[in-house]
Amino acid sequence: GAMAERTKLWVYFAFGAVFTLIYSITSHWIWHSGGWLFGRGMQDINVDIRNTPVGVEINRGYGDWLWGKDVRFENVSRAALIVSNENNVYTQVGMENASARNVPTFVRFRDSGKTLAGKGRDYLVKEFNYGLFIRQMGEPGQFSTNYKTAALPASAAPTRALRALPASNDWANVLEYGAKGDGSTDDTAALQKAIDSKRTVYLPLGFYVVNDTIRMKPDTVLIALHPGLTQLVIPNGSPQYQGIGSPKALLESARGGDGIVSGLGLATGEVNNRAVALLWRAGEQSLVDDVRIQGGHGTRLYDGSRADPYKKDAKFDTTAHWDRQYPSVWVTDGGGGTFSGIWSPSGYAQAGFYVTNTTTPGKVYELSAEHHIRAEIVLDKVQNWEFLAPQTEEEVRDGADAVSVEIRNSKNILFANYHGYRVTRSYKPMPAAILVTNSSDIRFRNVHVNGESGFASCDDAGCATYLRASKFAYENAIRDVTNKLDVREREFAVFDYSGAQRKAPAPLGKVAKLEGGFYSIAGGVVDAQGKLYFVDRHWKRIFSWTKDQGLVVVRDAPLDPVNLAIDNSGNLMVLSSYGPQASVYAFDPRKPGLDMTMIQPTPVAGRNGGRIAVPVNFWQNGEFKDQLNPDTYEFTTLAEMFARDVALPKANQYVSPDGSLALPAYRVLRQGAEDHLGWRWADSLQTHGFVTAPVGGRVVFTNGSENRTFSGVVGAGGGITDLKLVANRGGEGAAVAPNGDVYVANGQVFIYGKDGKQKGRIDVPERPLQLLFGGANKRTLFILTHHALYATQIN
């Protein structure tokens, strides 16, 4: 059932013996003759891998998020793990408590040829981690390896990650106790009677209306086979769930029991303020597996239609009831156990997964908590819990102000293969994915905080796909609320939060805050005299700034400006998101009035001379197409795809009024309405700004999908060729100083010399997004962040 709704699996695989393999799929993976060959996210729990040259192999040229616990390797001749793409933030690999028997090499690094040898014939890998390590908050990470082994203890029978369900001949069918499941009959009494009478109760497909709490016995097992088509449903306005009062559960476990709930959907409606979908106080051996909280996106109704959480009509506004119920899944009062495959996307609830007041161990496998108004996952006064491959998703409307995870008054917590995602349609900045307050001993392994996803569409220009990279991913991965510290890196393999750090290291460099209070600024450009122009897109304002004049509003017409460029005559070219393929207009910012010139795209062929404006940051589209070479069983790498695609010239371009500047007409995909209410996606719109060079000249730009900075030769139509690596960092943007040093915005501002080595860093109070050299002598580095404009002087 969950697989039908989400791209997730939890399956049983045989490697000589059958044990549980739990993994998340976000891209490609295959079984090759030498072992698992995969890309983009995998988690192994309690897995046997035997009699094979390679255990798990990460594709050539790809980073990955690989996490394993209690994995057993036996007779693996070449390497248990082959790690690719070293010294890249997207390579995050970790193993805990992995046993190795006759495995001479535990890790082989493909690119460097380095190896981590086994310790004798049989050994235990207590810890292995590779990737970016965060040593303390307020500092960038460094690439490192952690490898700790020990003697292998005597063999013991492995413990299943997920308990087995009782045999089907022990199941009692709830229909035999009078339940109807017809979406209208009150089945409360029949459900409770079945539970009181039998240990294992089976619910056939149906919608079972409930008007009071269904209470489990300590050993109750509730089994359904599809959480979308088998639901317990509280009807709107159910009397016992109304008004202000203490939480009242739809389904409630017994305290300290070892009950099981499997394959069931729980629907608390929209207008039931006191509702909790699942109130869990059961013990460490209990299990909640494949449970879907209904009420959010994708909710099935009894008549086969889908609920719309955005629906508004003359009689009812669903959005008025967001964040009006208690948490959907609430584990409290000593509750614990194993939670696997929970999908909790109901924005009517306070949070998707809420754990309070417990030291009972808990293990959470592949939780997806989404679409809540304030927080997706909350821990308060919690100890001894593990979250393995949790995902959160914050929507543009119901999640614009939401944090992914809140951890309060807690300790001894593990988050591994964590994914904090804000949808690409987001338009509002948010400071941090994870908030930590008054806590300690929180271990983070393999953290991925992002805001990009693929989109496919057809329009008058044909069909196309595009990887939309949002400008509004969380600015920081983690914020220590107590000590006012941040982890600015959004991709890393290891960070141990102790709670003991009280202040950040002294900042490097010196920056001055010139202006503040913006919604989100970017799209800047500097004219020949060094004056800065930039856009606050949300408020549709174009500003200028100079030392003498300060901040000036240049234009504030409602024309949806996004990015600016400037020609040799001082005319501003404005790329607007308005129009089916976006629009470009120009005006002279030195002249008063509202005169402007609309610029239509014209063919590139036949035009010589002038500068070409190209994006300062790109994101490579690695989705949708089959990248596997069946002869070599290798995938086209992101680097190969990027070099191929960025070299393609555009057929048309927008030429400035004086002919000195051309903006290639990048393909624009529309999502939503054709007017200003729809979204537009294009490299030229998703970038934080433009860089320019004449045909045959070099530009410096970043590839966010590799997190690297390159230089390349610009051709007619904006194709960029002859790529050369400039820096092994590359986030939101880059700029070249008068002396040739390259400044890269990637959490902080990193300075690289002509030899490609880092030679300095400038720490900025907020995440830098765009860098521009300006001022009278072009030695003022302007640093644009979402909410403020900073500057520093470069000697």
Please give the residue ranges for each predicted region.
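Hydrophobic alpha-helical transmembrane bundles of multi-pass membrane proteins
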Residues: 1-41
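Classical protein tyrosine phosphatase
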Residues: 9-15, 211-225, 375
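Long amphipathic alpha-helical scaffold regions
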Residues: 43, 75-79, 101-104, 217-244, ...
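Extracellular "leader-to-stem" segments immediately downstream of a signal peptide or signal-anchor
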Residues: 43-200, 227-262, 267-270, 281-342, ...
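Well-ordered beta-strand segments characteristic of repetitive beta-sheet solenoids
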Residues: 44-48, 70-72, 94-97, 200-203, ...
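Beta-propeller domains
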Residues: 63, 324-327, 333-376, 381-384
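Tight coil/turn sites that cap or link beta-strands
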Residues: 205-206, 219, 227, 334
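Sequence-structural signature of mature extracellular/luminal beta-sheet repeat domains
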Residues: 494-795
